[in-house]
């Protein structure tokens, strides 16, 4: 079996309906973020601001290229793996999709003072990371559906198949996205983008 056939089979793991649902929930969360900031809803502000401060503190634009790449890739890989595993808890993937939009938009609002939708989704890093995030969430939703309909025993057998999709679809997208992001950080001297560690996309600072 050639590589094209392998990837054609892998794409078959993605439920298109769940992929679109993940994207819709993400944007719903992003549009809800201004209310979160305006009303100072602390339970929804704490995590994105905490992790963003931690990333800014530990990511030095002057650090070696591979070190920056490894850090950004590792953080996003862990975040998106959690999206997949969350399917074992049925309702978590849709919740995570919504919160991902909230978290990234909150950081954008705090950093630049407004929510710029087009830079949020139409920059080189976002064009790679957002689909990766939605794929991981759709895999988690598929897993959650199996848990609900057939129970954990059947769902766990599906998990290993879904994990293949994560390894061969999600991780390559994240690897290239981290490469692009670090290249931009080095070229422009910027801090990391608001997507780092959250598994989604954002506008440049």
Regions found by a protein language model. Give the residues of each.
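N-terminal signal-anchor transmembrane alpha helix
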Residues: 9-45
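Interfacial helix-start motif at the membrane-water boundary
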Residues: 56-86
């Amino acid at each position: 079996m050639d590589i094209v056939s392998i990837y054609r089979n892998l794409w078959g793991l993605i439920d298109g309906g769940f992929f679109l649902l993940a994207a819709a929930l993400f944007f719903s969360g992003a549009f809800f973020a201004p209310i979160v900031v305006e009303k100072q809803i602390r339970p929804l502000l704490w995590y994105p601001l905490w992790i963003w401060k931690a990333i800014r503190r530990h990511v030095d634009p002057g650090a070696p290229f591979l070190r920056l790449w490894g850090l950004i890739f590792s953080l996003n890989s862990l975040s998106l793996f959690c999206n997949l595993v969350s399917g074992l808890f049925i309702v978590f993937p849709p919740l995570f999709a919504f919160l991902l939009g909230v978290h990234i938009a909150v950081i954008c609002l705090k950093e630049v003072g407004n929510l710029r939708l087009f830079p949020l989704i139409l920059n080189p890093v976002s064009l790679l990371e957002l689909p990766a995030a939605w794929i991981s969430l759709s895999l988690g939703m598929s897993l959650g559906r199996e848990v609900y309909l057939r129970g954990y025993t059947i769902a766990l057998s599906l998990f290993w198949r879904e994990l293949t999709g994560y390894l061969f679809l999600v991780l390559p997208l994240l690897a290239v996205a981290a490469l692009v992001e670090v290249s931009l950080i080095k070229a422009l001297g910027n801090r990391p983008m608001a997507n780092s560690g959250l598994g989604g996309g954002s506008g440049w600072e």
